[in-house]
Amino acid sequence: MNASKLPLGSFVGTTLLLFILYKLVKLAYYVGQAKKTGLPYTLVPVLETEFLGKLLTPLIRPLFTSRLSRGEGWPRWIRFSILDWAWEEKRRVHEELGDVFLLVSPEGLICYTADADMCWDVMNRRNEFLKPRDKYKVLEPYGPNVATTEGKAYNFHVRITAPPFNDGSGANDLVWNEASDQARALMESWSQENTTRDLSLDINRLTLAVISYTGFGKRLDFETEVSDLRNKIPPGYKMSLHHALHLVTTFMVKILLIPKWIMKMTSMKEIAIAHGELEKYMREMIRTETAKLSKDSEYQSADAKGNLLTSVLRASAFEAKAAGRKQAFSEDEVLGNLFLYLLAGYETTANAMTYGFITLALRQDLQDRIIQEVDGVYAEAAAEGRTSLNYTDDFEKFQYTYGFMYEVFRLYPGVCIITKMVPKDTTITVYPENNSPQQHVLPAECRVYLNVNAVHYHERYWPDPWALKPDRWMGTIGVTPNSRPNKKVVAQDKSRQVRGTLMTFSGGARACLGRKFTQSEYISVLATVLGKYRIVLGEGMDAKVVKQEIDHLAAGTVTLAPLKYVKLALKKRTDVKTG
């Protein structure tokens, strides 16, 4: 019978049946591949990243909110099909299937690992374990960058983007000072109102102001209201720089996932305009700074200290000169890396700081210890004739605060899964506890997902893993000898020993270049705020509920973020009774 003469219902039914058969054949093929590896495996019909998974997530997630908030995780039948399931599951799936297992679907194989030694091995074999292009292309709305490139292109990007973050570049000093200034403005704002504030909004304002100045050299006052951002539009533009920055950072998820042409046809039109306007502003800044570099020999001195934009352009100029080329980075490559700085320096830092503030409000005992350390550092500075702190003299004195920061990074990592793939058959080594290492061969195109949560909450690596214990970073066991006897670097040296067991900043050959930049901002804000104030829960906030929900639920942004409803307050230290 001719297909055109089939009833519509029969045609649809036949098509659906053929589609299901096609999926079953593919599933059977990948099951065969999984068996050859010798690893345990489990089956799933639909992955979280497929269209159907994305469609199901907003429909199904609300049905399980109560269950998730109690820390019970997802039912087995649905967990792998829900976006961002890994945060709610923590280690549960690995306790059932093992530290290393395969997830088999009609789309292929995914190797999930919570084995820290294997994670470290994978992160260091960067030419064998690549970043999946389909996963990372989304991070190139303006151009390629150091996070999305591979091979020789990655080496090229690192040579130019790494120097701006070195201690001698001045970037860490710049971010410390700006973060301290913005934190003082935050305190002034909170103290004047003497009320509960929107924590999420204020932390985001602070970090946006910091990255605006340290990234582009454009100062944004903490108190600037959204309505004020709309003013002062230069000729040739449709909105101000800071309004564009505000919209792009606020709606980062939509910009990364939704095509611009779709946004222009909907209520998201203003977001699409902001996306284009920010690109226009950044290209203008790139051209202006490039012109300065070409005209002013002192301006392009290797010892000159500037914002990240200036530093990247300077490093690019030196790279080009060393290679005998006219230029190193193209304008698109500079733009792509500036966007990456914006993403990491704004959203990731803001979320980590928010988790830290909430934790301190819940744990006044931890706040006591940090305040004690802060007071001690300020006293040392006063004895030296200084009225304020700075990065060079004071950053490394914050040992307990550093340990607290790293515990927050461990318990609430910005990225829950680090994704890799093998372009050809590749051998992995699994390191079972109390057993000999085992080798397995993963087939070409197999994804390898490093489950950050499952490692960070693993008792094998972190005794009492759910507990936030800054002191675990203060021990000297396994710490390299201090080569700088005048520096208090125990906690920092300790953080270098946890190979593969702490992946907040990734690790190995592709560790985050800006981790010291983030640490400087984080500690500067805490030292400034806690020098005069305490962080407490706002009125009406139930500590038990808040703790449950920051541990088990998330806001569903590009990086891990707490739910937005948590309210905090700043109280003068003299007004708060503790103990």
Curated annotation (Swiss-Prot):
<feature type="glycosylation site" description="N-linked (GlcNAc...) asparagine">
    <location>
        <position position="194"/>
    </location>
</feature>
<feature type="transmembrane region" description="Helical">
    <location>
        <begin position="7"/>
        <end position="29"/>
    </location>
</feature>
<keyword id="KW-0560">Oxidoreductase</keyword>
<comment type="similarity">
    <text>Belongs to the cytochrome P450 family.</text>
</comment>
<dbReference type="InterPro" id="IPR050121">
    <property type="entry name" value="Cytochrome_P450_monoxygenase"/>
</dbReference>
<keyword id="KW-0325">Glycoprotein</keyword>
<dbReference type="InterPro" id="IPR017972">
    <property type="entry name" value="Cyt_P450_CS"/>
</dbReference>
<keyword id="KW-0472">Membrane</keyword>
<keyword id="KW-0408">Iron</keyword>
<dbReference type="GO" id="GO:0004497">
    <property type="term" value="F:monooxygenase activity"/>
</dbReference>
<dbReference type="Pfam" id="PF00067">
    <property type="entry name" value="p450"/>
</dbReference>
<dbReference type="GO" id="GO:0043386">
    <property type="term" value="P:mycotoxin biosynthetic process"/>
</dbReference>
<dbReference type="GO" id="GO:0016705">
    <property type="term" value="F:oxidoreductase activity, acting on paired donors, with incorporation or reduction of molecular oxygen"/>
</dbReference>
<feature type="glycosylation site" description="N-linked (GlcNAc...) asparagine">
    <location>
        <position position="2"/>
    </location>
</feature>
<dbReference type="GO" id="GO:0020037">
    <property type="term" value="F:heme binding"/>
</dbReference>
<dbReference type="InterPro" id="IPR002401">
    <property type="entry name" value="Cyt_P450_E_grp-I"/>
</dbReference>
<keyword id="KW-0503">Monooxygenase</keyword>
<feature type="glycosylation site" description="N-linked (GlcNAc...) asparagine">
    <location>
        <position position="390"/>
    </location>
</feature>
<keyword id="KW-1133">Transmembrane helix</keyword>
<keyword id="KW-0349">Heme</keyword>
<dbReference type="GO" id="GO:0005506">
    <property type="term" value="F:iron ion binding"/>
</dbReference>
<dbReference type="InterPro" id="IPR036396">
    <property type="entry name" value="Cyt_P450_sf"/>
</dbReference>
<feature type="binding site" description="axial binding residue">
    <location>
        <position position="512"/>
    </location>
    <ligand>
        <name>heme</name>
    </ligand>
</feature>
<keyword id="KW-0479">Metal-binding</keyword>
<comment type="pathway">
    <text>Sesquiterpene biosynthesis.</text>
</comment>
<keyword id="KW-0812">Transmembrane</keyword>
<protein>
    <recommendedName>
        <fullName>Cytochrome P450 monooxygenase ORF6</fullName>
        <ecNumber>1.-.-.-</ecNumber>
    </recommendedName>
</protein>
<dbReference type="GO" id="GO:0016020">
    <property type="term" value="C:membrane"/>
</dbReference>
<dbReference type="InterPro" id="IPR001128">
    <property type="entry name" value="Cyt_P450"/>
</dbReference>
<comment type="function">
    <text>Cytochrome P450 monooxygenase; part of the gene cluster that mediates the biosynthesis of PR-toxin, a bicyclic sesquiterpene belonging to the eremophilane class and acting as a mycotoxin. The first step of the pathway is catalyzed by the aristolochene synthase which performs the cyclization of trans,trans-farnesyl diphosphate (FPP) to the bicyclic sesquiterpene aristolochene. Following the formation of aristolochene, the non-oxygenated aristolochene is converted to the trioxygenated intermediate eremofortin B, via 7-epi-neopetasone.</text>
</comment>
